[in-house]
Amino acid sequence: MGDILGAVYDLGHRPYLARRTVYEDRLILSTNGNICRAINLLTHDNRTSLVYHNNTKRIRFRGLLCAYHRPYCGFRALCRVMLCSLPRLCDIPINGSRDFVADPTRLDSSVNELLVSTGLVIHYDRVHDVPIHTDGFEVVDFTTVFRGPGNFLLPNATNFPRPTTTDQVYMVCLVNTVDCVLRFESELTVWIHSGLYTGDVLDVDNNVIQAPDGVDDDD
């Protein structure tokens, strides 16, 4: 999905890269299930009413799984990583909530049906079999794309609701071992309408890109 962002054009209008930010945090993981952490992502789309369309929020997530105590170094661990989002107006679990899954001690635990019924969207859900090192080991490196506010996914999003300042995105982790630390960082790239930005149009790798034929550069 990262390739899509290299040339995001909306109804003949040309969006611009507005801001790129990196968020870093960590979770202390164990089979007891401290599994939920909110990631509040600034969308930067509340500046003026000139925003023609919503921002596209591209998130690149990278996680490092480290041993909390040295005796665990050299062992392997199964780590289930989930990235979820909830609608802006629904009741959301607090940080550290065990309510995302039915049984936090099981890697194959099902997602809470009540949360799904209220609009929970799971953008990433995968189990990784990784060795544990004290100097860290890359667990996950993936990209997901949100069309927001409202966390609409990019490819089929055609409606443009009013702007908001944050999205409710949650990192959920389950492990089959104890005393691990998951340090994660998320890189957020935001696109806005050309009326709010006058710099070069950039792709996801900071290369200047040109508008396709028929698209007005100044629109």
From Swiss-Prot:
InterPro entries: BNYVV_p25/p26 (IPR008419). Pfam families: Benyvirus_P25. It comes from the Viruses. This is RNA-3 uncharacterized 24.7 kDa protein. It comes from Beet necrotic yellow vein mosaic virus (isolate France/F2) (BNYVV).
